[in-house]
A protein has these predicted regions:
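Donor nucleotide-sugar binding/catalytic pocket of nucleotide-sugar-dependent glycosyltransferases
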Residues: 155-199, 205
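A conserved mid-protein helix/loop that constitutes part of the nucleotide-sugar donor-binding site
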Residues: 33-37, 217-232, 249-252
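Conserved acidic donor-binding segment of nucleotide-sugar-dependent glycosyltransferases
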Residues: 324, 328-336, 344-349
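Aromatic "clamp/platform" in nucleotide-sugar-dependent glycosyltransferases that forms part
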Residues: 291
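Short alpha-helical donor nucleotide-sugar binding micro-motif in glycosyltransferases
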Residues: 270-271, 278-283
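Conserved donor-binding/catalytic core segment of Leloir-type glycosyltransferases
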Residues: 21, 201-221, 227-231
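A short, histidine- and acid-enriched strand-loop-helix "catalytic/donor-clamping" loop
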Residues: 129-148, 160-163
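Short hydrophobic beta-strand element within catalytic cores of glycosyltransferases
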Residues: 308-312
Length: 387
């Protein structure tokens, strides 16, 4: 039994309908909100419970503090965890097999790909449990393009799945690549776990020109690229004020380079969710130079704070939100292009206002309610008439 888990968190209610079970790597702030909403809707539908089984209490590179679940039941599976990098983790939790046998779910949701998900998929096949596979991934970030073991794992998990769930058409393309019929894919958008407590402030009340928010690494988040863009703006005669929220291996390098250049830069380190509204509302422009985020909820956090975004095309949010809906600027990862684009956005208040208006039109489609509705649309055919 996982530490802190009660028997009621693990075993189904014998008097009620069989539960829905989600197997995931680790809880995140937005998935906690999602599962609370999904649990509420399932309970209201037919009294069905939602159980969430995590492979690890928390990813090592994350510092999120998660509130305890109120409406869904959560347990952490014992097993092996390899922290391969700041963004890559490998989970092997064979305990998922007896746990699923005890829970006897009416439907199973597998959140992404790992050996643990393969164990769960095998158990579901043996017990004829209908399975949904969910991924944030898009073709550009799919490791199956380059790795035969990754391709095999994904095909083994996706093959025969009842449906797929993801936040973008790109996620549907990834699942289709591994055998899911396209008509079985259902959109369930990603969304911020918080909403701004007040209307966004005007630009005149924002003390910083540029904001970076995320893990301070180069291989995924592009933190060194961000540094080069800031220094490039200075070389064009524009010493900008900068705020950096987050931590990681490049922090010392970034601090030193900005200090040597005589630039005003504030480094907050890691911040909890409660501090984020003030952070995002403190800058006139948010830079998201991602080199491979599967999505990028930080983009939506900036947009809902009235902060326009300049992003790379190498993320789900860059292509599936900013580019698709014209609510942000997307540029190739070329420093000179980003310097020019950033300065143009900072100098053109009407352009920033146009981007804000476009974001206001599209963000209502990227909410917790819309995400829950996507899950329910995928689950309803599986739960109809099932005890």
């Amino acid at each position: 039994m996982a530490a802190g888990a009660r028997p009621s968190d693990i075993l189904p209610d014998a008097s009620g309908p069989r539960p829905v079970v989600v197997v995931t790597g680790a809880l995140a702030p937005y998935t906690h909100v999602l599962y609370e909403g999904l649990a509420e809707r399932l309970a209201g539908r037919d009294g069905r419970a939602l159980h969430v089984l995590s492979c690890t209490p928390r990813e090592r590179a994350r510092q999120w503090v998660m509130p305890p679940p109120r409406l869904y039941r959560h347990a952490v599976l014992p097993g092996l965890r390899w922290h391969r990098s700041s963004i890559r983790n490998l989970y092997v939790n064979p305990a998922v097999v007896p746990r699923l046998a005890a829970l006897r779910p009416a439907a199973l949701v597998l959140n992404d790909f790992s050996p643990t998900m393969l164990f769960a998929r095998g158990a579901a096949r043996l017990r004829r449990i209908p399975t949904l596979v969910r991924t944030d991934g898009v073709p550009e970030t799919d490791p199956g393009q380059r790795s035969a073991p990754h391709r095999w794992l994904r095909r083994a998990i996706v093959s025969g799945a009842a449906a797929g769930i993801g936040p973008s058409a790109g996620s549907g393309a990834v699942l289709a690549r591994y055998g899911l019929p396209p008509e079985r894919f259902v959109l369930s958008p990603l969304f911020p776990a918080w909403t701004p407590p007040a209307p966004p402030p005007p630009d005149s009340a924002r003390p910083y020109d540029l904001l970076f928010c995320g893990m301070l690494n180069e291989e995924v988040k592009g933190a060194r690229f961000f540094t080069e863009v800031v220094l490039g703006c200075r070389d064009r005669g524009r010493p900008l004020s900068v705020r950096v929220a987050g931590d990681g291996p490049l922090r010392a390098e970034m601090e030193a380079r900005f200090a040597q250049a005589g630039l005003s830069a504030r480094f907050d380190g890691f911040l909890g969710q409660e501090a984020l509204p003030e952070v995002y509302a403190s800058a006139r422009l948010f830079l998201f130079p991602s080199r491979g985020d599967v999505w990028g909820i930080v983009v939506q956090e900036a947009l809902q704070s009235g902060t326009p975004v300049l992003a790379s095309p190498h993320s789900g949010a860059g292509r599936g939100l900013l580019e698709a809906h014209g609510c942000g600027a997307v540029r190739p990862m070329v420093v000179a292009d980003w310097v020019a684009a950033a300065l143009r956005l900072l100098d053109d208040g009407s352009l920033r206002e146009d981007l804000r208006r476009a974001a206001e039109r599209v963000l209502p489609h990227f909410t917790a309610e819309a995400a829950v509705a996507g899950y329910l649309a995928a689950l309803e055919p599986l739960l109809h008439g099932r005890p």
